[in-house]
Amino acid sequence: MNKKPLILGIESSCDETAASLITENEQGIPVVLSNIISSQVEVHKEFGGVVPELAARSHMEKIDLIVQKAIIESGRKVEEIDAVASTAGPGLIVCLSVGLSFGKAFAYALNKPFIAVNHLEAHALSPKINLELNYPYLLLLISGGQDRKSVV
């Protein structure tokens, strides 16, 4: 029996700090073991939109706790993590830098690979978490200031 990889994913592209642990089942279907999200809606509400500097500061304040909670909720140990992935873009650069720096440092500390993830490509492939996809499929993606119509 092959060991299934355990990946720590980190998201900080805009106004949510998130961490998740994911693996796969025997059929190769992704299995989400934990998914912790901290929203910044209240932080930005009075400004009528996301303030990048405030968003980045909020990420810095919360990212360690969010990752810890994700690991605990997954029921796995930090030593079992095989790789760390973080959103690399598109997104707000000051926010992305928080997740990327944390993810790279975490991977380095564990002596594990680091994976930079394209935010839009991840959205495009996220249906695989709950569905068996038949390629090609039509994708309409609207995320923040980005939109795409594609055949995947």
Task: Explain the meaning of each model-derived region.
Residues 1-152:
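Short acidic/glycine-rich loops and adjacent helix/strand connectors
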